[in-house]
Amino acid sequence: MSQNSLRLVEDNSVDKTKALDAALSQIERAFGKGSIMRLGQNDQVVEIETVSTGSLSLDIALGVGGLPKGRIVEIYGPESSGKTTLALHTIAEAQKKGGICAFVDAEHALDPVYARKLGVDLENLLISQPDTGEQALEITDTLVRSGAIDVLVVDSVAALTPRAEIEGEMGDSLPGLQARLMSQALRKLTGSISRSNCMVIFINQIRMKIGVMFGSPETTTGGNALKFYASVRLDIRRIGSIKERDEVMGNQTRVKVVKNKLAPPFKQVEFDIMYGAGVSKVGELVDLGVKAGVVEKSGAWFSYNSQRLGQGRENAKQYLKDNPEVAREIETTLRQNAGLIAEQFLDDGGPEEDAAGAAEM
């Protein structure tokens, strides 16, 4: 009896293998070679290529060393929180590796002087300032399908005005028009983005939902489609000012990884964005160094390998600016301890704090 059942299982297994082979060959005949394959056959499919955000702490918090290529990323937050700055830093990092980048400026507000200060190569940056949302997304689709673009930024979703709204009268009610536009565009774009290995960053604004009694009343514009299609969603906020005497020199910024399909989400980091200079890398080295135990802090003094960096955080930052070789050494050590630091980020910004954000995913 047991031999008969064993033979039956073997026969079924052979039949299934034959049926699968026949199905695979039929699919390849109909849709071309490579339309279906076993995932383990091609190692490159598993590996995720990333681009640095320009912030060491955010790269570590993302879990894969930066923002993923071939995926959709959403950066959202209040006004003047650093959304465009973060996107421009990502463009600058991609250009350093020889990548070609594009910026679809739907807000018509890109400052080329500031972009250059952040390290963006303006001569090799493609820029478009479209008149309508349809035109912006059509340009985005064409650039992505070309396969030549590494990073494409759309600034911003809220400024993608549907053609019907532009051609209509002021005060016309056109409910759901922008949401439908985004939903259709993302359905078309998502396959091309994956095939071309192009990262598309959508910058988004915040709106308030009326009549919300419990949870966060905040929501992002353009409907729910982008929340689903995005592999990474970053919530960026200004939490304070950096002052030198009475003059404000920059912003203290907090970024929460609200959604992450590539690593554990709900991590949050804090860094400085200095006016006219962008993300303060030396400030991050001091803060992360103390967190990882690489930089020692005794009272107000900061030291590294028994060598004093300065009294007070600003003096320590200035020392690292003046001594780039020490800064490089600290950065190398921090990257080697990235796993331990990432766990501390998770402890700092747990899922309880981000329950509202997670509900929006």
Swiss-Prot record:
Gene Ontology molecular function: any one: ATP-dependent DNA damage sensor activity
Keywords: ATP-binding, Cytoplasm, DNA damage, DNA recombination, DNA repair, DNA-binding, Nucleotide-binding, SOS response
One GO term describing the cellular component: cytosol
Biological process annotations from GO: DNA recombination; DNA repair; SOS response
Keyword set includes Iron: no
Cross-referenced PANTHER family: MITOCHONDRIAL DNA REPAIR PROTEIN RECA HOMOLOG-RELATED (PTHR45900:SF1), RECA (PTHR45900)
Localization per record: Cytoplasm
Family that this chain belongs to: Belongs to the RecA family.
InterPro entries assigned to the protein according to its UniProt record, in alphabetical order: AAA+_ATPase, DNA_recomb/repair_RecA, DNA_recomb/repair_RecA_CS, P-loop_NTPase, RecA-like_C, RecA-like_N, RecA_ATP-bd, RecA_C_sf
CDD domains noted in UniProt: RecA
Protein name (Swiss-Prot/TrEMBL): Protein RecA
Originating species: Brucella suis (strain ATCC 23445 / NCTC 10510)
HAMAP family according to UniProt: RecA
NCBIfam families: tigrfam_recA
Main location, first listed in the record: cytoplasm
Protein purpose: Can catalyze the hydrolysis of ATP in the presence of single-stranded DNA, the ATP-dependent uptake of single-stranded DNA by duplex DNA, and the ATP-dependent hybridization of homologous single-stranded DNAs. It interacts with LexA causing its activation and leading to its autocatalytic cleavage.
The gene coding this protein: recA
Binding sites annotated in the UniProt record for ATP: 77-84
